Curated annotation (Swiss-Prot):
Enzyme class: isomerase
Pfam families: Pro_isomerase
Catalytic activity: [protein]-peptidylproline (omega=180) = [protein]-peptidylproline (omega=0)
Lineage: Eukaryota, Fungi, Dikarya, Ascomycota, Saccharomycotina
PROSITE patterns in the cross-refs: CSA_PPIASE_2
Residue ranges occupied by any PPIase cyclophilin-type domain in the UniProt entry: 8-158
Residue ranges, compositional bias (Basic and acidic residues): 228-269, 277-296
Function summary: PPIases accelerate the folding of proteins. It catalyzes the cis-trans isomerization of proline imidic peptide bonds in oligopeptides. Involved in pre-mRNA splicing.
Keyword Nucleus (UniProt): yes
InterPro entries documented for this protein: Cyclophilin-like_dom_sf, Cyclophilin-type_PPIase_dom, Cyclophilin_A-like
One GO MF term attached to the UniProt entry: peptidyl-prolyl cis-trans isomerase activity
Protein's recorded name: Peptidyl-prolyl isomerase CWC27
Subunit structure: Associated with the spliceosome.
Length: 327
């Protein structure tokens, strides 16, 4: 320390991706600017900012904090504080008098006498942490003053506060995480397989054969028959009555001179009934008509596809009973 340079009274540490940077502050000589700077450190405002401006072998500068201050600070130049070596920390301004702020700060890498009485000097880098500043200054650049991968401030530690009345701002105090209200769980249905097995032991499956031979079931069916006629019984009786009436009709023969006897009529009736059955069977079957090829040399001139289903027909019995006179 120069014999003319006053002693520092406060101290903070900026933790960066290139290593820690320890800064000692002249809080007594530059009270207003150092007070705001320490308050920003208490509120962790510099966390997340980067050294986005790098001028080789000259200086490095941080980006602005997320919530810049609207209050402009007055110039606090001190006759014993000069930019006469590397590792000095200064406040930025708006290129005019009494417009200083510590939303961003810079660190020199060489003596910069041109900054005297132009920028406010309020701190200096201590110990070996100056080499971490050199690492930041040696970063690869993607443009004239912009680094390819800028170093970032990840944490801040207050080592010597000096201003005892400073506390962390309430709006920056992290609120404890609120516990989420537990949702009422729906009661789960517990399946008791033991009880189900016990209930199933009294149930026995029976086959269809066993059911038919079951005496209880047969008694029920027999009881149902006794209660009254079912629909099937009524149909059976109707069929029997129809058969009896048809038999009586067969026996009745009109008195005609050409009567041939009951046996002959019965045979003819059987033939007629068989023909009727064949006719009904043919009607039940699907009517597939195959197209026939006619030979004009041997086949007669007729329409083989002619539909005669709607023509009048006469059975054999009626044919026998009718008299046809020749004209």
């Amino acid at each position: 320390m120069s014999s003319l340079e006053p002693a520092t009274t406060a101290k903070v540490a900026l933790i960066t991706t290139k290593g820690p940077i320890e800064i000692e502050l002249w809080a007594k000589e530059v009270p207003n600017i150092t007070r705001v700077f320490i308050q920003n450190c208490l509120d962790k405002k510099y966390i997340g900012t980067t050294f986005n401006k790098v001028i080789k072998d000259y200086l490095v500068q941080t980006s602005k904090i997320k919530e810049p201050a609207t209050l402009k600070l007055k110039d606090e130049f001190h006759s014993r504080l000069k930019f006469n070596k590397r590792g000095l920390v200064g406040a930025v301004h708006d290129d005019k008098r009494n417009s200083n702020n510590v939303d961003s700060l810079f660190i020199t890498l060489k003596p910069t006498p041109e900054f005297n009485n132009n920028y406010v000097l309020f701190g200096k880098i201590m110990g070996d942490s100056i080499y971490n500043v050199v690492k930041i200054n040696e970063s690869e650049l993607k443009s004239e003053e912009t680094p390819m991968y800028p170093a970032e401030i990840t944490d801040i530690k207050i080592l010597v506060q000096y201003f005892d009345d400073l506390v962390e701002s309430k709006e920056h105090i992290a609120e404890p995480a609120k516990k989420k209200a537990k949702k009422a769980k729906k009661p789960r249905v517990k399946l008791d397989y033991t009880l189900e097995d016990e209930e199933d032991t009294g149930f026995k499956m029976k086959s269809a054969h066993d059911l038919l031979s079951d005496s209880k079931l047969s008694n029920k069916l027999y009881a149902n028959k006794k209660k009254g006629p079912s629909e099937n019984n009524e149909k059976q009786k109707t069929i029997e009555k129809a058969q009896d009436s048809s038999m009586e009709t067969k026996k009745i023969v009109p008195e005609r001179p050409d009567y041939k006897g009951s046996e002959e009529i019965e045979n003819e009736t059987k033939i007629t009934s068989s023909e009727n059955m064949n006719h009904e069977t043919k009607q039940d079957k699907p009517n597939y008509k195959a197209k026939l090829d006619r030979n004009p040399n041997i086949d007669s001139d007729y329409d083989s596809d002619l539909d005669l289903s709607s023509s009048e027909s006469i059975d054999l019995f009626a044919f026998k009973q009718s008299n046809f006179q020749s004209s």
